[in-house]
């Protein structure tokens, strides 16, 4: 439906029928999702109720940690992404030239938008700035398990604090978000690493800084790529896979990592983390501690990931603002699949508080007034939009899992009209004045 406008613009004279028809059933684009309300017709469909459940948990835990919610536009200048990642990222984006001749893209990630926003107005906010968002992100890439061409994501970031205590705070937030869904230390682990340690390793063996990004990309894919292919790529850069494997296995924590581990241990969260230099994060802008969350059974790709990006604000602001920063992203696709497999998604009940029966159409105006009164009292109430037989109305009330039915009773001679309230679970019935109905519906049956 269009939100307004003249139907004649679309060749629909006088609001009539469309002068054309589609030759086939329209479907969504590959890699995109439709979200349906429960109950779902098919088990492989995406649940709007599950999505809202996840959003609710994300928001609740982030707010407990003192994070404030923000948002930004889904379209950004293409340069915002090529500035930090180079032109090669364009192949992964949904980008186009708009009618004003601007090169723009659907956002593939939220961090550059946030860095732009903070750089523009950071002087108005006391540090550290702790913000979160739940954006929808888009990437034109090959679909695979746990990865589509769009997803929603919890982004949580801290600006203006360079101390590792901020890194520990962010990791603790991620742990508690995962725990809020019923996941335990038996289900997931946060793997901590350090880009500083890897940078030292690289600099000691290669004088060509221009090869660093390619090196990090290879390390980031070691677990997913054939060892022979990784060995060859590393050799081309002057590195030896066996030496790198030994460095990873040694796993000696840096000073910053030890500080984070001690901080988390003081919170009772040490069992959820381990140092693992296999994690390096492929994005070019990471500068310090990096981390990823994995399910311990190894059934899924990384659940979440993030780290420090102390130079990004300076880069995006053209050198005008320099703020240390760190953050993580936590997508909904892998999380939903993980919760399904672990049996941790709740049953989403679409039950309503009451269904208003209208068995006498002369009572419809009074019934509508009752419905409105109950809804304004915060109750979920439905009623038949058009005249229907009483048995059909009652069946509809049961289908909607109504806790009660309500209906006006004929007023006795000289008496006050009453509302008949029936509890469909206990089968108890009572007749009440209209003003007493809302409190009665809100009171649990004993």
Question: How would you name each of these model-derived features?
Answer:
Residues 6-8, 13:
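Acidic, Ala/Val/Gly-enriched low-complexity intrinsically disordered segments
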Residues 22-272, 277-285, 290-302, 311-318, ...:
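Extended, charged alpha-beta segments that form solvent-exposed binding/catalytic grooves
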Residues 10, 18-22:
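Aromatic (phenylalanine/tyrosine) cluster motif
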Residues 22-25, 256, 260-263, 267-275, ...:
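NTP/phosphate- and nucleic-acid-binding module
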């Amino acid at each position: 439906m269009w939100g307004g406008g003249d139907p004649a613009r679309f060749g629909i004279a006088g609001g009539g029928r469309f002068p054309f028809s589609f030759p086939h059933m329209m479907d969504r684009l590959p890699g995109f999702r439709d979200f349906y309300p429960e109950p779902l017709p098919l088990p492989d469909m995406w649940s709007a109720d599950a999505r809202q459940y996840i959003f609710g948990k994300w928001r609740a835990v982030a707010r407990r940690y003192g994070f404030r919610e923000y948002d930004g536009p889904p379209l950004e200048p293409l340069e915002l992404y090529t500035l930090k990642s180079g032109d090669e990222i364009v192949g992964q984006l949904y980008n186009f030239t708009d009618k004003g001749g601007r090169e723009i893209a659907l956002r593939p990630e939220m961090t550059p938008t946030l860095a732009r926003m903070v750089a523009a107005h950071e002087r108005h906010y006391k540090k550290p700035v702790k913000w979160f968002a739940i954006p929808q992100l888009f990437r034109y890439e090959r679909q695979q398990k746990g990865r589509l061409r769009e997803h929603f994501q919890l982004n949580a970031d801290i600006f203006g604090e360079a101390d590792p205590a901020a890194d520990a705070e962010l990791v603790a937030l991620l742990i508690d978000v995962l725990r809020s869904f019923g996941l335990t230390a038996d289900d997931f682990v946060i793997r901590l690493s350090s880009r500083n340690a890897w940078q030292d390793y690289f600099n000691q063996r290669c004088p060509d800084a221009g090869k660093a990004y390619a090196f990090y990309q290879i390390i980031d894919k070691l677990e997913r790529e054939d060892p022979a292919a990784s060995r060859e790529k590393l050799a081309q850069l002057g590195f030896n896979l066996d030496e790198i494997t030994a460095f990873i296995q040694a796993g000696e924590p840096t000073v910053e990592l030890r500080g984070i581990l001690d901080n988390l241990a003081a919170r009772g969260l040490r069992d959820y983390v381990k140092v693992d230099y296999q994690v390096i994060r492929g994005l070019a802008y990471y500068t310090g501690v990096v981390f990823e969350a994995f399910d311990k059974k190894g059934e899924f790709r990384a659940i979440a990931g993030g780290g420090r990006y102390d130079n990004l604000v300076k880069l995006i602001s053209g050198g005008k603002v320099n703020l240390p920063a760190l953050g993580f992203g936590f997508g909904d696709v892998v999380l939903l699949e993980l919760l399904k497999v672990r049996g941790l998604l709740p049953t989403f009940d679409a039950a309503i508080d009451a269904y208003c029966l209208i068995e006498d159409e002369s009572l419809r105006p009074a019934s509508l007034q009752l419905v409105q009164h109950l809804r304004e009292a915060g109750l979920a109430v439905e009623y038949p939009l058009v005249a229907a037989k009483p048995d059909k109305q009652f069946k509809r009330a049961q289908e909607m899992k109504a806790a009660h039915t309500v209906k006006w009773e004929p007023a006795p001679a000289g008496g006050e009209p009453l509302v008949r309230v029936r509890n469909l679970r206990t089968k108890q019935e009572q007749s009440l004045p209209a003003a007493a109905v809302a409190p009665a519906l809100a009171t649990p049956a004993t």
